[in-house]
């Protein structure tokens, strides 16, 4: 949120969100670094950024009591918590007679802008994508290049140290994104040993790059890459129209799936100790870097849900803690896709065999050897499950 009394710049870090994270969470470090950059830029114009830390509703109430606020501007957020938070902020502002303006920002199309002819939301990706492209080609997409900072409020707020906010440095750094990787994305995207992905996820997630700028740059470069950006918006509109997916299956008929939920097996999956190299390499990469190649994400998710028969919500929550590019909509949508419980999901009989996947996408074990140093040592664990025995009971099969 930015609170503006004419040209006064303020930012509120939401305690309800950050208190659930480790103090050295790399994403908090990333946000802090970019807020500091904003503050330094403002100081060039004799202004500064005031940083608050707390419950946003309480902070806004306190601000309105202390200073005169003309209006508040913020961007739309489509997660249920954020929607309720912003409604609470709006109510507080109304008590003080302060207008509350919200805007679309993190997507090209939102909410009801890409729907069926009858106004209902799409629940299958391909027709959504086709309508999205049709609308995009009919819409003038512009990048705001306004750089007029002459009317900023003069201020010199001290920028807080990370420690003052209760955080500490992280050993994990968010990498810079590289759009040069987009050119051959369709040819290289499934090979995890290649450094062939743009790493743009965290930057889209935290708004350090404009989705409009990115789409305009890649739309004529690689259609496969553009499709991935459209998938992101597809899952966002699913979350908007069907908020129950946060904690429930998209399709209620799968609520009777009999998850085994073996805690010891889940722990081994988290630690990359399943005895299946492709799965373990992915989990070890995630734990060390906050990143996992998309092909490997599908393999690890399928293994957890369809070989170990552990509830997708367990895996979704673990990824939420670790992924630098974590977005609720995409994370939830992809996990439900892998489990077969979501919209446009992989059916129960589609199982990513991690051993067969090696033959297709890491035949020389280049990726695996990078992340599993003890692959051929006695210390490497034995497989925790027989791949020939997929844990789908007959009642569970019937539920599908």
What are these regions (language model features)?
Residues 5-9, 13-136, 221, 284:
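Trp/Phe/Arg-rich N-terminal binding region typifying the photolyase-homology
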Residues 35-40, 88-89, 109-114, 186-191, ...:
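Intrinsically disordered, low-complexity boundary segments flanking structured domains
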Residues 120-254, 357-389, 393:
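Glycine/tryptophan-enriched, flexible segments
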Residues 196-369:
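Active-site-proximal binding-pocket segments
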């Amino acid at each position: 949120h930015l609170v503006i009394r004419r040209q006064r710049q303020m930012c509120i870090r939401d305690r309800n969100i950050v208190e659930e994270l480790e103090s050295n969470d790399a994403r908090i470090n990333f946000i802090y670094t970019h807020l500091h950059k904003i503050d330094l830029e403002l100081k060039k114009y004799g202004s500064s950024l005031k940083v608050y830390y707390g419950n946003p509703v309480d902070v806004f109430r306190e601000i309105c009591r202390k200073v005169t606020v003309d209006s508040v501007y913020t961007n739309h957020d489509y997660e249920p918590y954020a929607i309720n938070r912003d409604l609470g902020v709006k109510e507080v502002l109304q008590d003080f007679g302060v207008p509350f303006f919200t805007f679309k920002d993190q997507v090209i199309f939102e909410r009801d802008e890409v729907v069926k002819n009858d106004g209902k939301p799409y629940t299958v990706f391909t027709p959504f994508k086709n309508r999205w492209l049709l609308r995009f080609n009919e819409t003038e997409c512009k990048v705001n290049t306004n750089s007029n900072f002459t009317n900023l409020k003069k201020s010199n707020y001290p920028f807080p140290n990370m420690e003052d906010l209760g955080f500490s440095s992280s050993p994990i750094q968010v990498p810079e994104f590289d759009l040069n990787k987009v050119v051959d994305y369709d040819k290289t995207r499934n090979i995890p040993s290649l450094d062939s992905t743009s790493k743009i996820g965290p930057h889209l997630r935290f708004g350090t790059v404009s989705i409009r700028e990115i789409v305009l740059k890649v739309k004529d470069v690689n259609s496969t890459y553009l499709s991935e950006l459209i998938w992101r918006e597809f899952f966002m509109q699913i979350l908007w129209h069907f908020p129950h997916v946060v904690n429930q299956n998209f399709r209620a008929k799968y609520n009777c799936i009999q998850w085994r939920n073996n805690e010891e097996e889940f722990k081994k999956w988290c630690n990359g100790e399943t005895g299946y190299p492709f799965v373990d390499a992915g989990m070890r990469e995630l734990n060390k870097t906050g990143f996992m190649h998309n092909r490997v994400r599908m393999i690890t998710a399928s293994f957890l849900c369809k070989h170990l028969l552990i509830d997708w919500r367990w895996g979704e929550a673990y990824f939420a803690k670790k992924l630098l590019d974590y977005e609720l909509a995409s994370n939830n949508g992809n996990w439900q896709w892998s489990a077969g419980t979501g919209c446009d999901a992989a059916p129960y009989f589609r199982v990513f065999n991690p051993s067969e996947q090696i033959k297709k996408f890491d035949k020389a074990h280049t990726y695996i050897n990078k992340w599993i140093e003890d692959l051929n040592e006695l210390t490497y664990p034995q497989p925790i499950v027989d791949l020939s025995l997929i844990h789908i009971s007959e009642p569970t099969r019937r539920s599908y």
